């Protein structure tokens, strides 16, 4: 009689193992996400406390932290900032705001804010700002960089005793990036700003031209660490005493038939006014500050030692004598323009 061999029971590990592994991973990821959420909440509280010590109070209405499973989202139904760093209190209020970071890429934060916004400024001024869309991004890891993109931003400035001014653009972009090629002691940050369809009342009044314009600016700011304190009198004074400079490597501004190309360097003088030297080329400018100049600028270059050569200028542009900002005044060559004195920034 033949003996029957016992049948080996098949292991069910491969049937249940993947499922159990998936459950373990899900539980571990959930634990990690809630841990990260707790860390973010704690860091927010610490950051708000540090800001309050520096004279800036942030208010995030109905604050919440969500985004499970792959994101961390900080949401505010309204966002407000009150700063006392300018003497008189400055308050900015916006609509809903959200900051988002991927759990697997926490070094990049995307920030979106809904309008409108309202700013209460010193001397009783009010600035109302609206936009179609507004988004920013901030990368913490080297090289640090920041970007802002706005569609149809529009601002209305109300100053007691003066006419209301409306500022705006069809599109605006701004990019900042720490320059990795400059010496670390320079603390250099590259800046690129472009705007299309601009409406800038002071420029309109200066040139007697209300047509929409375009601006393309590239520059490098040195001693940029001064502005980790924010943009306020203390930060500006720290930047000035550290011999900070704004190096304009490219400036192109068009407004109807008028165009200005230039470069140069700007600083703050001891009385906190903008100072420096610019190399400009221009075309189509009919007046400056109400003074009819016609073809005067083109003739100035030839009059001042033949410096009106257009060798370095774009086609159709006339190279101007050096433009200097000193002692609160604007000079073209030796001639002072009939403009209001430049006010101190702080």
Show the residue positions of the predicted features.
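Flexible, membrane-facing loop/turn or short amphipathic-helix motifs
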Residues: 80-89, 117-129, 154-167, 197-210, ...
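N-terminal beta-strand/beta-hairpin edge segment
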Residues: 53-184, 251
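Hydrophobic membrane-insertion alpha-helices, especially the h-region
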Residues: 16-33
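Alpha-helical transmembrane signal-anchor/signal-peptide segments
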Residues: 34-52
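Extended lipid/amphipathic-ligand handling interfaces
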Residues: 63-65, 94-105, 130-143, 167-184, ...
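Extended terminal
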Residues: 2-19, 61, 234-245, 251-253, ...
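Loop-centered beta-sheet repeat module
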Residues: 2-5, 19-22, 150-216
């Amino acid at each position: 009689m033949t003996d029957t061999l016992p049948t080996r029971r098949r292991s069910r590990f491969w049937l249940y193992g993947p499922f159990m592994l998936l459950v373990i991973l899900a539980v571990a990821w959930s634990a990690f996400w809630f841990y990260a959420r707790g860390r973010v909440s704690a860091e927010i509280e610490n950051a708000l406390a540090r800001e309050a010590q520096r004279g800036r109070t942030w208010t995030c209405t109905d604050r919440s932290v969500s985004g499970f499973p792959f994101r961390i989202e900080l949401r505010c139904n309204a966002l407000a900032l009150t700063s006392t760093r300018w003497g008189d209190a400055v308050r900015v209020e916006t609509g809903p705001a959200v900051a988002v970071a991927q759990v697997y890429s926490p070094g990049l934060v995307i920030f979106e804010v809904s309008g409108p916004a309202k700013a209460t400024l010193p001397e009783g001024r009010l600035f109302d700002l609206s936009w179609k869309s507004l988004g920013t991004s901030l990368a913490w890891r080297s090289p640090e960089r920041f970007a802002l993109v706005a569609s149809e931003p529009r601002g209305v400035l109300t100053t007691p005793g003066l006419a209301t001014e409306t500022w705006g653009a069809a599109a605006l972009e701004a990019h900042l990036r720490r320059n990795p090629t400059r010496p670390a002691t320079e603390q250099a940050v590259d800046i690129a700003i472009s705007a299309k369809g601009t409406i800038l009342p002071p420029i309109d009044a200066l040139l007697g031209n209300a047509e929409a314009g375009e601006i393309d600016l590239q520059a490098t700011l040195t001693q940029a660490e001064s502005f980790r304190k924010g943009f306020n009198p203390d930060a500006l004074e720290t930047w000035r005493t550290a011999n900070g400079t704004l190096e304009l490597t490219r400036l192109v501004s068009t407004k109807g038939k008028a165009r200005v190309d230039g470069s140069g360097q700007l600083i703050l003088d001891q009385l906190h006014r903008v100072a420096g030297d610019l190399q400009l080329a221009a075309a189509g400018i009919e007046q400056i500050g109400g003074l009819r100049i016609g073809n005067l600028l083109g003739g100035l270059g030839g009059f001042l030692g033949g410096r009106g050569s257009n060798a370095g200028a774009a086609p159709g542009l006339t190279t101007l004598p050096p433009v200097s900002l000193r002692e609160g005044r604007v000079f073209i060559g030796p001639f002072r323009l009939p403009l209001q004195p430049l006010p101190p920034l702080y």
